[in-house]
Regions:
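Fungal secretory targeting signals
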Residues: 1-18
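Short beta-strand elements
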Residues: 818-831
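A glycine-anchored, Pro-Gly-centered beta-turn/N-cap motif
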Residues: 799, 804-806
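Glycoside hydrolase catalytic-domain context in secreted enzymes
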Residues: 14-704, 708, 715, 721-793, ...
Length: 831
């Protein structure tokens, strides 16, 4: 009765469009759906051999600095199974050497090139694989980019679910085709850094920020790219630090059990972000499968899981089938990508670059060779350079100021952003400074530079090759008089600025010049971008180690710029309509971030309120020109959409749990300080737990249905990884002719937008894109396919996707504001 009432109340709240996460239990167990079947069967066979302690070792990290990687599970020596290695980052192998520093995700999005995204995924995975990494902690779809101030937006792709989703899928496919497990992160609503873990700086709050997101916005915006990741077969998903609707993401049963594992039929494992776990039993029942890094607080030696998870299974609080499912999900991902074939020993250490050191870094034990300095770079500099040049966006080019001809006699470069970091290329830990040119952001999503070709170095080399002379003023303290004198003498001036500094240099007078921006996202340029002395503006983003070479390729015309901005550039800060929280807004309780803008972020907001941007989403110039013509929209017959039906089988139980004596700490193992183990210290479970509340009735903290392993109904919106298979039925084919009307070969990015037509819908949303290379005068036909999902809305009442009766319109062009072709879409979808 109580359970039925709760379900009814939850359904009512969702139907009313409230930001609410109702409880959803039990955690769905993996079935081996779709392409997971063979890997799942192998995982079941493997897990069936394990003891309870060995299963716990798979699910629990050994603690911060308890192994050579940033995250390490326990091992299973009896079966020759070593610890699994989790390692950052989304743009290369973090905390090592002889690795490549790849362009950031935002640059990949600016290419609008799925092949480049795939190739970058392959190259990054080759390097992680070569270092012995099992799980690369990327790519990123959270943050999506709700507000331009989001500190980690650059790690992801774009504030658009389709562009991000397709980039996610291609990156994941590249990584996993190469034999490394990808990790889609940070799930979900992780849209700011302030208060993501609660208290910070001068503010004390009880809990992490809550992202309060209604059901429509969650499905149509923030969940969309994660669905693409699941459909692409991603092996792991990382739950985030923040709360979703006032429930911690790693313990939110609605987002993990109901949506991710139910609706999206995710077959892999959910990994916590480092320190994002807030309970033991609760998170296990809510759908978390692996705890990282394993300890409650770094180097504390205490754990929510480990011994405590062993106890919870022994006393029946966590059912046997749940721990079995956790282990099966982890091993399914392992086998799916072929780690049993591609795994090599871990040959680096995250905590030091010294050749010899302690394997157990915090404990200071296990002295051995920990860094073999394996060079994993191969020829990856080529793809770095290619992505760097392909992602450059030409924002302004007056009277053909670019490309440079190479005949300029005197080229001058201005700005700290053009030069080297005086403290060395890796002089700041995790790149946590802004000295010299900006080629990646900072934080855990970084990698060490093996070198960094600065713009100053690359431009000087080009100028000298052409017989010119060159000077660079990269000291931000240089006098304006000095800069003015040099500028007046130069044939061409190139001014460099980044997101943090450098705008003062654009006031240099006496010569026309070009401006290059290295930024993590949009910046306000309206005050100066139309200055007559600024003849060209390039956005180069965060291009990685080949920064200068990629830029020179475009500056001198060996590469015709084809990048399109993956975000909108507003004229003033208020244009975006969203912001992050800088100060607590809920007393000492969890800060509350209400996503009241709904689906209207970035260009959707600008369009809804008729705000004119400086540069719109999808905008980018070329050294050539292009035309669009002959739009053809062909509806395709599609069967009626049928909600998924039926039931799962019962939760499988693999092996047999013995009594507590079987799980006592082995006397042949030496304890390592602060290392997290699965074993008991006593056969008395209360004593072994050390928990003063041990023995409470499960009714006090175990939700209704959480322990139920009986057959469960299939989620009607589910049925296969990524959601109901009918969502991906093609419903229309779009064809358009694109012609290069200029005098040089170039690249154009056709973009397909759709208006869903409803009063609550955005004026238009991106639904497809391509990248065409065309010679001068050449034309080609570009084709795109719309799926049922592309023309559907999330219905909160039926809790499923529906195609509305509103008139739908197709638009094609080369930016969100330049769409010369449009046509009404007459669907042939059965009912």
């Amino acid at each position: 009765m109580r359970n039925s009432l709760l379900i009814s109340l939850a359904a009512a709240a969702l139907a009313e469009g409230k930001a609410y996460s109702p409880p959803a239990y039990p955690a769905p167990w993996a079935s081996g759906a779709g392409e997971w079947a063979q890997a799942h069967d192998r995982a079941v066979e493997f897990v069936s051999q394990l003891t309870l302690a060995e299963k716990i070792n798979l699910t629990t990290g050994v603690g911060w600095e308890g192994g050579q990687c940033v995250g390490n599970t326990g091992s299973i020596p009896r079966l020759g199974f070593r610890s699994l290695c989790m390692q950052d980052s989304p743009l290369g192998v973090r905390d090592t050497d002889y690795n490549t520093a790849f362009p950031a995700g935002v640059n990949v999005a600016a290419t609008w090139d799925l092949d480049l995204a795939y190739r970058r995924g392959v190259a990054m995975a080759e390097e992680h694989r070569g270092k012995g990494v099992d799980v690369q902690l990327g790519p990123v779809a959270g943050p999506l980019g709700r507000a331009p101030e989001g500190g980690r937006n650059w790690e992801g792709f774009a504030p658009d679910p389709v562009l991000t989703g397709q980039m996610m899928a291609s990156t994941i496919e590249g990584m996993q085709d190469t034999g490394v497990i990808a990790c889609a992160k940070h799930y979900i609503g992780n849209e700011q850094e302030h208060f993501r873990q609660g208290s910070q700086e001068n503010y004390t709050v009880a809990d992490a920020i809550s992202s309060n997101i209604d059901d429509v916005t969650l499905h149509e915006l923030y969940l969309w790219p994660f669905a693409d990741a699941v459909r692409a077969g991603v092996g792991s998903v990382m739950c985030s630090y923040n709360q979703l609707n006032n429930s911690y993401s790693c313990g939110n049963s609605y987002s993990l059990n109901h949506i991710l594992k139910g609706e999206l039929d995710f077959q892999g494992f959910v990994m916590t972000d480092w320190g994002a776990q807030h309970s033991g039993v609760g998170d296990a029942l809510a759908g978390a499968d692996m705890d990282m890094p394993g300890d409650v607080a770094f180097d504390s030696g205490t754990a929510f899981w480990g011994t405590n998870l062993t106890i919870a299974v022994l006393n029946g609080t966590v059912p046997e089938w749940r721990i079995d499912d956790m282990a099966v999900r982890i091993m399914s991902a392992f086998y799916k990508v072929g780690r049993d074939r591609t795994q090599v020993p871990i040959n680096f250490a995250s905590w030091t670059l010294d050749t010899y050191g302690n394997e157990y870094y915090y404990a200071g034990e296990g002295y051995k060779e920990i860094n073999q300095h394996v060079d994993v770079r191969g020829d990856h500099a080529k793809v770095v350079r290619e992505i760097g040049s392909a992602s450059i966006v030409l924002l302004k080019n007056v009277d053909g100021a670019l490309p440079l001809t190479g005949s300029e006699r005197f080229v001058a470069v201005f700005g700290e952003d053009a030069g080297s970091n005086p403290d060395g290329v890796n002089g700041c830990s995790d790149r946590n400074c802004d000295n010299g040119t900006l080629a990646m952001g900072w934080g855990s999503g970084t990698a060490n530079f093996p070198y960094l070709v600065t713009p100053e170095q690359a431009i000087q080399a080009e100028v000298l090759k052409n017989g010119g002379i060159f000077t660079a003023i990269t000291d931000s303290g240089a006098t304006n008089t000095t800069a003015t004198t040099v500028a007046a003498q130069a044939s061409a001036c190139l001014v460099f600025a980044n997101a943090d500094s450098g705008e003062g240099y654009i006031t240099v007078d006496g010569n026309v010049g070009d401006l290059v921006l290295h930024t993590v996202g949009p910046v306000l340029v309206e005050d100066w971008v139309n200055h007559p002395n600024i003849t060209a503006v390039l956005w180069a983003g965060l291009p990685g180690e080949q920064s200068g070479n990629s830029l020179v390729d475009v500056l001198y015309g060996s590469v015709n710029p084809g990048g399109k901005t993956p975000f909108t550039w507003g004229k003033q800060r208020s244009d975006w309509g969203t912001d992050i929280i800088y100060e607590p807004n809920n007393g000492d309780g969890a800060p509350q971030q209400d996503f009241t803008e709904g689906i209207f972020i970035d260009y959707r907001h600008f369009d809804k309120y008729n705000i004119t941007p400086t540069y719109e989403f999808g905008y980018g110039l070329s050294y050539s020109t292009f035309s669009f013509s002959n739009l053809q929209v062909t509806p395709l017959a599609a069967s009626p959409y049928k909600p998924a039906t039926g039931h799962s089988g019962p939760a499988p139980v693999l092996g047999k749990v013995l009594n507590a004596t079987a799980y006592l700490f082995p006397n042949y193992i030496k304890r390592i300080e602060a290392f997290i183990y699965p074993w008991l210290n006593s056969t008395d479970l209360r004593t072994s737990s050390g928990d003063p509340n041990y023995g409470w009735s499960t009714s006090k903290y175990v939700p209704d249905g959480a322990q139920d392993g009986s057959p469960q109904p299939v989620n009607p919106a589910g049925g296969a990884p990524g959601g109901n298979p009918a969502l991906y039925d093609p419903v229309a084919e779009i064809r358009v002719t694109v012609k290069n009307t200029g005098k040089v070969a170039g690249v154009e990015v056709p973009q397909l937008y759709v208006s869903l037509g409803g009063p609550s819908d955005a004026p238009k949303v991106l639904r497809g894109f391509g990248r065409l290379s065309l010679g001068a005068g050449e034309e080609a036909q570009w084709t795109a396919t719309l799926t049922r999902r592309d023309v559907s809305n999330w219905d909160t009442v039926s809790q499923n996707w529906v195609v509305s009766n509103y008139t739908k319109t197709v638009y094609v062009g080369n930016s969100s504001r330049n769409l010369p072709l449009q046509q009404t879409l007459a669907l042939k979808i059965g009912h």
